Amino acid sequence: MCPLTLQVTGLMNVSEPNSSFAFVNEFILQGFTCEWTIQIFLFSLFTTTYALTITGNGAIAFVLWCDWRLHTPMYMFLGNFSFLEIWYVSSTVPKMLVNFLSEKKNISFAGCFLQFYFFFSLGTSECLLLTVMAFDQYLAICRPLLYPNIMTGHLCAKLVILCWVCGFLWFLIPIVLISQMPFCGPNIIDHVVCDPGPRFALDCVSAPRIQLFCYTLSSLVIFGNFLFIIGSYTLVLKAVLGMPSSTGRHKAFSTCGSHLAVVSLCYSSLMVMYVSPGLGHSTGMQKIETLFYAMVTPLFNPLIYSLQNKEIKAALRKVLGSSNII
């Protein structure tokens, strides 16, 4: 039963006298319900993390764009991945930071679904780009003689565009379907972002087919890309172990190690969050998992790539004027 007498900010009852549905003007992102001093601490912590994430990924994207020696397919993919990370973290964190200092913590109906759309679309584009990067590594190590003829600049650009386009089309239909569903009061989403799991709890009518559709799409994009990456690196590992030179094996492992570390970091948190849709997870744990994937993963990705890659470190030193920081 929907509480007809409950008055909640942002809800307008339908004119029909016996209707229990409501038009939602806005949602309330509850976030972390804690004392004001802790809210200030979290705001400072996440603001610093956000600034470091933007700086790190921005530095890598800028350096790869400036240094013509790094205008190769591998670094073009990496530069686009860093650029994607900037937009991905910016799709949710700024609003989250505002809510830490706000008493109302509201977000408009359109704003909520736009945040949902960009958060999932950019995340899907990242998954696809990680898969393309694994394919690039496979060609470079397993098919070195054919690599220059296959992975041309033209194909590289096409693959990047394909990742962006497919990423933004993948969750378009679910977003439209969810936005058309009727809601009942209250309009409080017990989360830090507009996530589909807590949002489904506000529906007046159960929609298991739409939920199954959303989770199926999430599972397909996660497991499909993950299995392709595992398959690519299985072939890469077989080729590397067959190399007669220890120097060649070490170089190949160092090249693939950074990408594998990023893949492990991204997919481990993704599988926990969206393959098992909140079953057995407390609300607080779901918030922490989302924060980890939305903020911590983009923060560490540039560190992983820059610390393991001599070419990127050299380019950063050149751009920053041979600083001792790097």
UniProtKB/Swiss-Prot annotation:
Keywords: Cell membrane, Disulfide bond, G-protein coupled receptor, Glycoprotein, Membrane, Olfaction, Receptor, Sensory transduction, Transducer, Transmembrane, Transmembrane helix. Its main location: membrane. InterPro entries: GPCR_Rhodpsn, GPCR_Rhodpsn_7TM, Olfact_rcpt, Olfactory_GPCR1. SUPFAM superfamilies: Family A G protein-coupled receptor-like (SSF81321). One of its GO terms (molecular function) is G protein-coupled receptor activity. It comes from the Eukaryota. It is found in: Cell membrane. Glycans are attached at N13, N18, N106. Residues 1-44, 94-112, 180-216, 281-287 are extracellular. It is a multi-pass membrane protein. It holds the Pfam family 7tm_4. Belongs to the G-protein coupled receptor 1 family. PANTHER family: G-PROTEIN COUPLED RECEPTOR, OLFACTORY RECEPTOR 11H1-RELATED. This is Olfactory receptor 11H12.
